[in-house]
Amino acid sequence: MVNECKILFESEIVLLKIYNIIDFIYIQYKMIEKKINPITPSQRQTLLLKRGTLTRVFKVKSLTKGFQRSNGRNNQGRITVRHRGGGHKRLYRIINFDRFNNNIEGFTKKILYDPNRSANIAYIEKSSKYYLILAPDGLKINQYIKSSPNADLKIGNALPLRNIPIGSLIHNISLYPQSKGKLIRSAGTSAQLIQKIDDKYAKIRLNSGELKLVLLTCYATLGVVSNVNHKTIKLGKAGRSRWLNRRPSVRGVAKNPVDHPHGGGEGKTSGGRPSVTPWGKITKGKPTRKKKKLLIQ
């Protein structure tokens, strides 16, 4: 009788795992590439993602606001970031990155598309309070989300690094105690907690392989950021890039000598020197930061 109960229990566990895998595959299928009939060259190159499981229209006024793009200009009106301008008009969704606030808890009502970032966002609601947070991969509707030192070790919950097991995948990591999450917020990214040092620091490995030390009292959210297939997108045409507020980038060799170090020459030229920026700095392969600076100051 005991053996039969064990067999039944194990079979139920196996079935539950199978159902979870099927559910995960179904959700991933809903978010895979969108097939476009290749009538034109641009459509033939295009590779987009389906958003069948996402809510596109969001009408909570207190969590949205209009904003004027800077288009790469500073407060003096001078261009500090090139190749920015145009783009479709958007409403900004006010995301709550300060998960150290223990009052942030509730049920996930919607998974939303956000045109202002690569990741999806989640609408959290409890009684009369509601928030928008970054949606981790695998977050489900009606799942309970909590930010607390005593929160369960579940995807979407936020805890201090002190209370997160070593080896866990995390995102939205704050750099200082009582501050908003700054690291690991793009689609499909995650960091790994690999060590706790002297009961004071946590060593984390970022997506790039870089190691950082942050205080154990800093908060992080469990899981990988949603929309993991974002990197497979192919825009297909220049117009779609313009919709995203990106302007064309002119090659240096196509310019005049006064405008770029690679410019000028009679006919087509290769530039005549290693690739550099318009200001003469090497662009390919030159390190631009210190690798061994572990501590975030």
Listing of model-derived features with the role each one plays in the protein:
Residues F9, Y19, F24-Y29:
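Aromatic (phenylalanine/tyrosine) cluster motif
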Residues Y29-R117, D137-Q297:
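Basic, glycine/proline-rich low-complexity segments that contact nucleic acids
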Residues N116, I124-K126:
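Structural recognition of beta-strand segments within beta-rich domains
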Residues K126-K129, N207-G209:
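Glycine-centered tight beta-turn/hairpin loop motif at sheet-sheet or coil-to-beta transitions
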Residues Y130-G138:
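Beta-strand/loop nucleic-acid-binding surfaces
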